[in-house]
């Protein structure tokens, strides 16, 4: 949410800057691994792989739900025009590409429009966060597991 606010305030969001997303891509696995280590510490230094997986997936799903709620508040209350502005910027950038035909641009815009639907993007976000939470917790669980 912090990254989203910063990119919105600075105008980076409409420019399509991707580097702020790398902050999230770095922070998410760190948070998952930290949560697993804290769970292990609270559990007398015992951790099974299934416990690690539960923690990781739960962190992923909760983070996606929080981001989804923020996105809905942002897109419906704070700046209802933002998504249409983003779509316009995306269309303009695609039209600047000499290799893209009008048909390709229209097809891409249909795809972007589909994912601008809060229900579809929210479901996708929850699923992807759960999958990445599972992957990171599998790695962390294999490293940190210690059973009785």
Segments (PLM) and residue ranges:
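Transmembrane alpha-helical insertion/packing segments
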Residues: 1-38
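Membrane-interface interhelical loops and short interface/amphipathic helices
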Residues: 78-115
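Cytoplasmic-side transmembrane-helix entry/capping segments in multi-pass membrane proteins
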Residues: 23, 48-55
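Short helix-capping/hinge motifs at transmembrane helix termini and TM-loop junctions
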Residues: 11-12, 71, 75-79, 144-148
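Hydrophobic alpha-helical membrane-insertion segments
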Residues: 59-81
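Alpha-helical transmembrane segments of multipass membrane proteins
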Residues: 3, 7, 28-32, 63-67, ...
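Transmembrane alpha-helical segments in integral membrane proteins
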Residues: 117-147
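Membrane-helix interface/capping segments
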Residues: 37-51
